Amino acid sequence: MNISSQNVLLPSPIPSSSPMASHKKSWLSKHPNQSMTFEKPQLGQFVLTPEPSSNTFYAPSSPASAVRREPLSPMSFVRMRSHRVNKIGRSSQQCDHVLSTVDKAISRVHAIVTCTQDRMIIECVGWNGMIVSDKMRKSVFHMKKNDRIVLVRPNSDACPVLDVFGYRVLLGWPSDSEDEWEGNLNAKNYEENREPMSPSPQEALPLMPSSPPSQDYQNDQNHLILYTNSESIPKLNLRSNELVYPPPSKDLLQKLLALEKDGQVEKSDCSKNTQLKPSFLPKNTDDLLNGTDDNNIVLREVKVSFENEKIESDDLDKNEEISEGEEYTPIEESKEPITVRRDSVIQIDESSAGLTDVISELNFTNHNDDSKNSNITTSNDSPVNEVEPMAPELSSAVVEKKEPEDYESISAVDENTNDSNESLPSSHDYSESTKENSAPDSLLLGLVLDELVFSTTSTTPLPALSHLFPSNMPLQLIQDKLRDLAAKHPYFEEVKRYGTDANGDPLWSEWFYNPDVDDDLERRMRYAPLMRPVRSSRRVHKQYYWKKPRARPRSSGHSSRRRRLS
């Protein structure tokens, strides 16, 4: 068989989940940039595909090799934001970057990308998977749903390519200046996340998909210069734990010159200290605000700055050198990529703070109060220029300070509560404890009716009404409370349900408002136009169980013929 060289086309440089031929007027008829042109395949022009793409219609297992592709066409480029969740898919409401709004082979949210300065975590949540190409290691990941991979940033910043059913996106690594100063964000990246549907924010790179994107290093250097030369940002001295401010403004220098002429400042001191050193706040800030510490605040700042001439530490110098000439030091690449499956991820519930945490916090605050009192007595004897960090204090309105004798009683109460958590409290005890804080029945009934009327369903289940009650109130007690209201008000009706659902959770009752039984005309006129009518079939719960169908005995043809004749 002779195949002309004109019909032989080179394959795509990147393995892709190529879509099949378009069905008539189906959602596969559109493709980005119209890069797919189909011709009638000749005999022997089929290419074997060991992993064919998912399709919703019948198609041959091997696509035609005559499918023309444009591997060198411009590809959409998305710059990832550091420490942000970037979503890619079909939905323009949920995703930061939209691949296609027509092709339903793409899920609403198909990929979730979380990126840092040196790592990129790509998770596939689409129904038919996707392909990630890491060109630095020349590896291709065929990801299925709920698969997750971790990519390490290479030295050349080569960007991975995300391929979802033929729609390719170049995932750019975050810029180095993004973590330093988030206020000076690039306007192009900001608009890119604001308008995921518009084609203008997406940078079209006239390069091969395997080559890294061109970066504007001048903009990154400008961001660094703006951050390091900003005079309004205070710098933290790690050793002395004090705030260090930049040199004073021209107004302060003019005041110093005026004081020098008056003779309040010696010329020898000013000649030695032509450049003012950072000033430090005194220990007693109340005297400073009232003006009793020193009548001349400017002179006090000058004296303190002259006395603390050599206070700058080596840690501050190191921090300044890092901020002025900060460069990214890439991490050595690993030979094999890190692959994480969802099954191996252990989900740990968040721990809630108990009474023991409150007791430890009280002990900590009491200890700090004693240390503060001792520090205040010593500070009155000898003035100290350093500012000590103050621990957060708990207000008396939130937590009452107790004596050490009361801690034993609190611990005993804590043990009793842990033992009693296994069994639900009785309704009588709970009602007695919350009688003072409980709302009147009329107000509670009005809130419940509002929830029922404005609900999206005709009948509302009990868990949807639990937010109207205290958070620590069990659902069983909420159901008893609602049944008490239903006994007093007949228009507040219940659909009783029994048994459990597929997860083994109990099926709670459903509630609805029946305006036909309500005698209050004003309430009926207010609620009837807004609510959805409840059919009679919905007012009785039907529990359905799956049962294996019974096989009917097949009769012979003679017997069936006899029945037809008879």
UniProtKB/Swiss-Prot annotation:
- One GO MF term attached to the UniProt entry: chromatin binding
Pfam families documented for this protein = FHA
Q: Which UniProt keywords apply?
A: Nucleus, Phosphoprotein, Transcription, Transcription regulation
Task: Write out the annotated subcellular location.
Answer: Nucleus
Per the record's keyword annotation, is Phosphoprotein included, yes or no? yes
Domain (FHA): residue spans on this chain: 86-137
- Spell out which residues are annotated as carrying Phosphoserine: S73, S379, S382
Instruction: Provide ranges: composition bias, Polar residues.
Output: 373-383, 414-428
Q: Where is this region: Disordered?
A: 1-32, 191-217, 269-291, 312-334, 364-437
**Compositionally biased intervals (Acidic residues):** 314-330
Which InterPro entries does this chain map to? FHA_dom, SMAD_FHA_dom_sf
Cellular component terms per the entry's GO annotation: chromatin; nucleus
**Induction per the UniProt record:** Transcriptionally regulated in a cell cycle-dependent manner by the mlu1 cell-cycle box binding factor (MBF) complex independently of sep1 and ace2. Strongly up-regulated in cells arrested in S phase by hydroxyurea.
CDD domains on file: FHA_PLM2-like
Q: Does the keyword Transcription apply?
A: yes
* Any GO BP annotation: negative regulation of DNA-templated transcription
Role according to the record = Probable transcriptional regulatory protein Required for G1/S progression.
Family note: Belongs to the PLM2/TOS4 family.
**Protein name listed in UniProt:** Transcription factor P14E8.02
Organism of origin is Schizosaccharomyces pombe (strain 972 / ATCC 24843) (Fission yeast)
**Source organism lineage?**
Eukaryota, Fungi, Dikarya, Ascomycota, Taphrinomycotina
